[in-house]
Amino acid sequence: EIDEGSEARYIYLKPDNWLEIAKWIQSEPSLLFNSLQCQMGIDMGEDILESRYNFHSMEHDHYLEIRIRVSRSDAKIPSVEQVWRIADWFERETYDMLGIEYTGHRDLRRILLPDDWEGWPLRKDYQEQETYHGIVVPKIKEGWD
């Protein structure tokens, strides 16, 4: 699906064909999206998590954003860290904060939080822990719930 009503160039893809398309947009001579500039995750609400990838072709000087939506209950997207090496830490950060599992990733583990941290802090339904190993987890500011 392509949103042509926007100045931004983005395409929505289903997760099941993402890896094949990723390899194609990276190697197709007319595209050559050889630079993954950013990857991020967003909790869209209503049981939808979204992973976004921003690409640039240095040869053709064009840009593209790929968006992939999954449900919270089946938050799995094929990893592209073997296509663009930089995706390694991008995908790990999104996994750590939102719990999207990047299948096929060679080292998918938490990168910002301790391995035994409970939950996914950037999900809208996240319930913060009262304590962590007996230490009180403070709120950033009183009244923020």
Language model regions located:
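Terminal low-complexity/charged segments
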Residues: 1-145
